[in-house]
């Protein structure tokens, strides 16, 4: 299995009773995201309904700032995240409400994948790992290939690109002599 992380944006809704509801919207399925990853429909498997919401991918219990339900929504063809922030982090709660924190990072282990003709990583199956509130907002122009794919997948992708380029060179040379 290989670890992947992706970003999602956060929406804050004020309920009639004055409480806040939070929802994160993940990458669309079937579209290459800014990390060069394509998720196939409903490819991420979940071992349980709710997961701890971490702060900046922290592993310690002090970094648990809430809990979240992540799920595939067929109607929108996206992974959605409904989450609650605990009272132990009032500054983080306020920062989310004010828009200072507007990104989630979703991590999962891919168990079945391939690279398509554009060298994008196509995820066919994955096991959900964790979700974190992160300080870096979603940026459509950002490329996080090294962090998103990890070293092992980046090397594999580079080898595929090199092989395709070498094959193209051979085909070009062959055409010259035909």
Swiss-Prot record:
Record's keyword terms, sorted: Coiled coil, Hydrolase, Protease, Viral capsid assembly, Viral capsid maturation, Viral release from host cell
EC number, as in UniProt: 3.4.-.-
Gene Ontology annotations of biological process type: proteolysis; viral procapsid maturation
Superkingdom, natural source: Viruses
Presence of the UniProt keyword Protease in the record: yes
InterPro entries assigned: Peptidase_S78_dom
A Gene Ontology molecular function term of the record: peptidase activity
Coiled-coil region list: 146-178
Biological role stated in the UniProt entry: Probable capsid maturation protease.
Protein family (similarity comment): Belongs to the skunalikevirus capsid maturation protease family.
Protein's name in the database: Probable capsid maturation protease
High-level lineage: Viruses, Duplodnaviria, Heunggongvirae, Uroviricota, Caudoviricetes
